[in-house]
């Protein structure tokens, strides 16, 4: 289950190098197991006269003592006949409190501080929890964010897809969730940066340091410029750290993957390098299997959970593409961040009509919660249907009933906005946590017309009912 010391069990020789694919010859009676990590020393091109250690992962047994491996680093300087050592175990990463506030690569090496680690390490290749270890009941994960809790409730131990382009508030929402898990649930977060831009990873680390959430977070990065083997394994490395917090420290964990599409893309590259026949649209034939091995480990065990938020890039906006389509099969909720909503200054810019949740159903949530969510969605949908008429003829041409719908829908839309804790350094305004019961009461009251006399501005960026009344009082209405 755990590995603390690497033990060399066999030595082989490099037989062939083709880019990140390295064939290694071993004695037939000392073959390394599948997914074992192999080490080979090569000359470091960046530092003349110095050596560096490459890590290779066994991907195929070719027969006659030959194994095909994928390198986790660039293979510059690697030559045939170089000695290769089998570590006797898979790639391992540090686990436990040491990981908090640290930035790691796929191999578990610390990147942001010069600190050695001699403690416990776990292999990144692990089995999903057994069926009898799983939490049988479906439980809502309350965040304190009105629009999420009311309209797209998250499942404890579930998987949430996060859709959003650049500049619509995705990073702020991710940081806010990390903050709320740490402060409201006394939990910890793990962030896996899979195949994204190095600049974005650096920006995230800086912003998390500024907002004070990095000390409750472990970060693992395998960025866009790294070999496909690294990008394929980085999500597993992050998930292994999260599993330790769940299984050993008995904590609730929030696990972020940015971007899950890059995980699939890396798998496709590795599959091609290994000579497998491509499947639909050029993807790997084992796409569903690879995705399942990752997603099935993200779950609730008895009393503790890993809840996952996964940023999803949709190639060419085609939801039927095999990569996003395979991911959708595993999701419990989708949170869609909308540019038109963010342009109105409404944050979090969650689209209440496009976002969905599996548990927005009376079987899983209270009837009053379901009824309130349906009322909000109905009034917003009516408002959306009327917008074309308003744009062409103007609001004065609507009937009295439709005018009332628009009047209340605009207030509901603004009341879905909320100040966040992590944005306080920019806005100067404290974030708010709104209990679900208060959200239900407030939205029912707005739709029933109890606050029709309040100006629209009073509903903007406020928390619960008391905040709303305070805003209205400042605007001269009571």
UniProtKB/Swiss-Prot annotation:
GO terms for molecular function: ATP binding; ATP hydrolysis activity; proton-transporting ATP synthase activity, rotational mechanism. The keyword Translocase applies. ATP binds at residues 164-171. Keywords: ATP synthesis, ATP-binding, Cell membrane, CF(1), Hydrogen ion transport, Ion transport, Membrane, Nucleotide-binding, Translocase, Transport. Pfam families: ATP-synt_ab, ATP-synt_ab_N, ATP-synt_VA_C. Signal peptide: none annotated. Its main location: membrane. It is a peripheral membrane protein. SUPFAM superfamilies: C-terminal domain of alpha and beta subunits of F1 ATP synthase (SSF47917), N-terminal domain of alpha and beta subunits of F1 ATP synthase (SSF50615), P-loop containing nucleoside triphosphate hydrolases (SSF52540). The keyword Iron does not apply. It catalyses: ATP + H2O + 4 H(+)(in) = ADP + phosphate + 5 H(+)(out). GO terms for cellular component: plasma membrane; proton-transporting ATP synthase complex. It is found in: Cell membrane. Its EC number is 7.1.2.2. SMART domains: AAA. It comes from the Bacteria. It is an enzyme of class 7 (translocase). F-type ATPases have 2 components, CF(1) - the catalytic core - and CF(0) - the membrane proton channel. CF(1) has five subunits: alpha(3), beta(3), gamma(1), delta(1), epsilon(1). CF(0) has three main subunits: a(1), b(2) and c(9-12). The alpha and beta chains form an alternating ring which encloses part of the gamma chain. CF(1) is attached to CF(0) by a central stalk formed by the gamma and epsilon chains, while a peripheral stalk is formed by the delta and b chains. Belongs to the ATPase alpha/beta chains family. Produces ATP from ADP in the presence of a proton gradient across the membrane. The catalytic sites are hosted primarily by the beta subunits. This is ATP synthase subunit beta. It comes from Streptomyces avermitilis (strain ATCC 31267 / DSM 46492 / JCM 5070 / NBRC 14893 / NCIMB 12804 / NRRL 8165 / MA-4680).
């Amino acid at each position: 289950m755990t590995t603390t010391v690497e033990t060399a069990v066999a030595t082989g020789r490099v037989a062939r190098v083709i880019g990140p694919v390295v064939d290694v010859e071993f004695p037939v009676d000392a073959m390394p197991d599948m997914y074992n990590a192999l080490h080979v020393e090569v000359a470091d091109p960046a530092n003349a006269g110095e050596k560096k250690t490459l890590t290779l992962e066994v991907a195929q047994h070719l027969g006659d003592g030959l194994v095909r491996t994928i390198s986790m680093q660039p293979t510059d300087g690697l030559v045939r006949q170089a000695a290769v050592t089998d570590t006797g175990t898979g790639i391992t990463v540090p686990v436990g409190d040491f990981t908090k506030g640290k930035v790691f690569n796929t191999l578990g090496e610390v990147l942001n501080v010069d600190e050695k680690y001699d403690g416990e390490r776990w292999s990144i290749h692990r089995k999903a929890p057994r069926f009898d270890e799983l939490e049988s009941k479906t439980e809502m994960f309350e965040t304190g964010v009105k629009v999420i809790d009311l309209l797209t409730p998250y499942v404890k131990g579930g998987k949430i897809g996060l859709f959003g382009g650049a500049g619509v508030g995705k990073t702020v929402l991710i940081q806010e969730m990390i903050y709320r898990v740490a402060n409201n649930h006394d939990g910890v977060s793990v962030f896996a940066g899979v195949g994204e831009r190095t600049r974005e990873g650096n920006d995230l680390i800086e912003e998390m340091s500024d907002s004070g959430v990095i000390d409750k977070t472990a970060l693992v990065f395998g960025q866009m410029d790294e070999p496909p083997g690294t990008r394929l394994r980085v999500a597993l490395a992050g998930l292994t750290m999260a599993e330790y917090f769940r299984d050993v420290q008995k904590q609730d964990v929030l696990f972020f993957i940015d971007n899950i599409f890059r995980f699939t893309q890396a798998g496709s590259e590795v599959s091609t390098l290994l000579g497998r026949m491509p499947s639909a649209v050029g993807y790997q034939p084992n796409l569903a299997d690879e995705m399942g091995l990752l997603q099935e480990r993200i779950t609730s065990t008895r009393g503790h959970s890993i809840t996952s938020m996964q940023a999803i890039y949709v190639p060419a906006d085609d939801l039927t593409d095999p990569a996003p389509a395979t991911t959708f099969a595993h999701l419990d909720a989708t949170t869609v961040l909308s540019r038109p909503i963010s342009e109105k200054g409404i944050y979090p810019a969650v689209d209440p009509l496009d976002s969905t949740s599996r548990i927005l159903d009376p079987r899983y949530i209270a009837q009053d919660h379901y009824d309130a969510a349906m009322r909000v969605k109905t009034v917003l949908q009516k408002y959306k249907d009327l917008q074309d008429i308003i744009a062409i003829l103007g609001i004065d041409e609507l009937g009295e009933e439709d005018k009332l719908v628009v009047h209340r829908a605009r207030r509901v839309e603004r009341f879905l906005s909320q100040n966040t804790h992590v944005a306080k350094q920019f806005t100067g305004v404290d974030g708010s946590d709104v209990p679900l019961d208060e959200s239900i009461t407030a939205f029912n009251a707005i739709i029933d017309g109890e606050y029709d006399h309040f100006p629209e501005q009073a509903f903007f960026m406020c928390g619960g009912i008391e905040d709303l009344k305070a805003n209205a009082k400042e605007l001269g209405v009571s």
